[in-house]
Amino acid sequence: MKTIAFAWRYLWSRPLTAALNVLLLGLGLASITFLLLVSHQLSRAFERDLAGIDVVVGAKGSPMQLILSGVLHLDVPTGNVPLAAIKALQTHPQVARIIPVSLGDSFRGYRIVGTTGDYLKHYGVQLQQGVMWTQPMQTVIGAQVARQSGLKVGDRFAGTHGLGSSGGGGVVHEKTPYTVVGILASSGTVLDRLLLTATESVWKVHETDTALDAEDQKILEEEREVTLALIQYTTPLAAVTFPRFVNTTTEMQAAAPALEITRLLSMVGVGTDVLRAFAGVLLLTAGLSVFIALWSAVRERRAYLALLRMLGAPPGKIAALLLVEALWLALLATVLGMLAGQALMALLGWALQLEQSVLVGGIAWPVELLAVPALALVVALASALLPAWEAFRVSGFELLQSASN
């Protein structure tokens, strides 16, 4: 206990140097903490939103764009596909369930999604207030939508054409307002930031604005489209043959969410590697700074350390003072770094929420964070080894020699 207390006092005998070392090491650890949290929370968010969706079928174009627009709702869709073509897939022996998704409108930047009740069942989300829609032009809104927009059960609103995050600039469908009949409980899934309604609602909104007469209305009904379909397989073996079937025999494309998200994460990983390298440079710089500080401390305290040796302190205890001092630095920097990393993650989550993007943020302590104190320990001990060895070699005779001189 005395060694620990002495090391603490030695550390703060030079407060500016100690504070700078803690800050420098803490910044490196904060960067590592932030990267680990981003990776963990993004992976969890994608897992929640992609769970149980084996393939997405939509208009031809970019497969990644199809996944980002239809599952994560982060991009514009590749186009629409005929309703008849999607219905034809329902009879395919490898298809267990199809969930149609129709996009095109939004409210204050939040997307209005035409679908069926299976969409809610798929994610297992429960109603917090109100009831499910039972007819067109009724909507159930996500928890984040309700919180940010102020909409309540019974409120009416008109959608805006387009999926822009600003929610402005598009045509407002004032002739066909929606009525809020339910609010979903917060689930942490993509449903938190969506307004869900029957597919017929989306058709009705656009047919009302487009049809000039009854004949036009009939033609539009015969040519109805959806944006895409979320599909579950009857067997995992379908992943080999079903996408090829869709891509080669229809005018649509099939994209596997797991494959496209892996590609996305690998692309994002390039930027992550740069940040990780930057954090590594910070840690190396911090280690060098700690080494210089401890080495200087040994030089400055050499007479005092020699006095301790003359008073009977063993060499191991003298060296331990330097090692414990380094451990104090590691402990303080770890606390600072992990708190700063959590704060940065919360700030990122808040910013993404404002952009109606992926739901991340909040306090999380994944097992990967154990790497942070381990890194701090390695850097501190590596920096303290040579100074500790120098302290170990201090002899009581040095004090006598300096006194005789």
Identify the residue ranges that each predicted region occupies.
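Hydrophobic, regular-secondary-structure patches
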Residues: 36-111, 118, 135, 242-246, ...
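Transmembrane alpha-helical interface segments in multi-pass membrane proteins
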Residues: 282-285, 295-297, 302-349, 379, ...
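Mechanotransmission and gating elements of multispan inner-membrane complexes involved in transport
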Residues: 172-179, 183-272
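N-terminal Sec/SRP start-transfer signal
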Residues: 1-33, 323, 404
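Short helix-loop junctions at transmembrane helix boundaries
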Residues: 335-374, 385-398
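Alpha-helical transmembrane segments of integral membrane proteins
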Residues: 20-31, 272-292, 326-337, 371-372, ...
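Short helix-to-coil transition segments within interhelical loops
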Residues: 11, 309-316, 394, 403
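Hydrophobic secondary-structure segments that place a key small or acidic residue at a functional site
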Residues: 106-117, 125-213
